[in-house]
Curated annotation (Swiss-Prot):
A Pfam family reported for this protein in Swiss-Prot or TrEMBL: BacA
Gene Ontology terms: biological process: cell wall organization; peptidoglycan biosynthetic process; regulation of cell shape; response to antibiotic
Keywords: Antibiotic resistance, Cell inner membrane, Cell membrane, Cell shape, Cell wall biogenesis/degradation, Hydrolase, Membrane, Peptidoglycan synthesis, Transmembrane, Transmembrane helix
GO cellular component, one term: plasma membrane
Membrane topology: Multi-pass membrane protein
Gene: uppP2
GO molecular function: undecaprenyl-diphosphatase activity
Catalytic activity: di-trans,octa-cis-undecaprenyl diphosphate + H2O = di-trans,octa-cis-undecaprenyl phosphate + phosphate + H(+)
Protein's name in the database: Undecaprenyl-diphosphatase 2
Lineage top rank: taxon: Bacteria
């Protein structure tokens, strides 16, 4: 197998793992990185991304395995477990409905570097604005959330259908707006990623099953493992980071990165492809 392709697979796995749970948009980074690296054709690259995304999902499941095991064990008798699962389901549904309705149109028109870069900048400005507002904390732990809180965050997640917006960014910043603590908003975003990303990945994998190629198995394995390990580091690091800091640094990163992409596109320095 081509060593260069394996290195590219590892790079994309690293990009997915690091960016999936940070408020900087994994989809946006993968679109830009995939275009820059010229990795596979567009359809095969899409299948590869689906597989490495599952690695990131597995990482958050592993990190919160005790909590998830307790929830499953408590479904027969613990009302709090049912409340937790119900809140996840309520938050999960809005993106499903809008994704199935508008997913094809969004992919056709917005899945290219320049629209993604624009979304990076807009999202960064929103985070800066959100961090400068006062947010009275009403919910300090995920278990204190009501179904209304879950629905609001689910609606916020719908903005992430626009590539470059960031699913974690939309849900975390939305949670802050709605009165959740940084810890509660971030952890609920992690938990919400499990059904949301799993459903999206399996649905896309089923639609593209004809493209599954045994020749890609090595690339997928490398990308999956790197994605899992880097996502594990990112999840643990973000929880530590937010205990002492806000999200301003991510906002400035988004703005700077978006401006660089737009500048290289407009100057002709980089010929971005879809």
């Amino acid at each position: 197998m081509d060593l260069v392709m394996l290195i590219k697979a590892a790079i994309l796995g690293l990009v997915e793992g690091i960016t999936e749970f940070l408020p900087i948009s994994s989809t946006g980074h993968l679109i830009i990185a995939g275009s820059l690296l010229d990795f596979l054709d567009e359809q095969k690259r899409d299948v590869f991304v689906i597989v490495i995304q599952l690695g990131a999902i597995l990482a958050v499941c592993w990190e919160y395995r005790r909590r998830l095991t307790d929830v499953v064990a408590g479904l027969g008798s613990d009302p709090q477990s049912w409340k937790f699962v119900t809140n996840l389901l309520i938050a999960f549904l809005p993106a499903v409905v809008l994704g199935l309705t508008f997913g094809k149109a969004i992919k056709a028109h917005l899945f290219s570097p320049v629209p993604v870069a624009t979304a990076f900048i807009v999202g960064g400005l929103v985070i800066l604005w959100a961090e400068r507002r006062r947010h009275p904390i009403r919910v300090r732990e995920v278990d204190e959330m009501t179904w209304v809180d879950a629905l609001k965050i689910g609606l916020a997640q719908c903005f992430a259908l626009i590539p470059g917006t960031s699913r974690s960014g939309a849900t975390i910043i939305g949670g802050l707006f709605f009165g959740l603590s940084r810890k509660a908003a971030t952890e609920f975003s992690f938990f919400l990623a499990i059904p949301t990303l799993t459903a999206a990945s399996l649905y896309d994998l089923y639609k593209n099953r004809a493209l599954l190629d045994g020749d890609m198995s090595g690339l997928m394995a490398v990308g999956f493992v790197v994605s899992f390990l880097s996502a594990l580091v990112a999840v643990r690091g973000l929880i530590r980071y937010i205990s002492r800091h806000d999200f301003t640094v991510f906002a400035w990163y988004r703005i700077a990165f978006g401006l660089v992409v737009l500048a290289t596109a407009w100057s002709g320095l980089v010929s971005w492809s879809a």
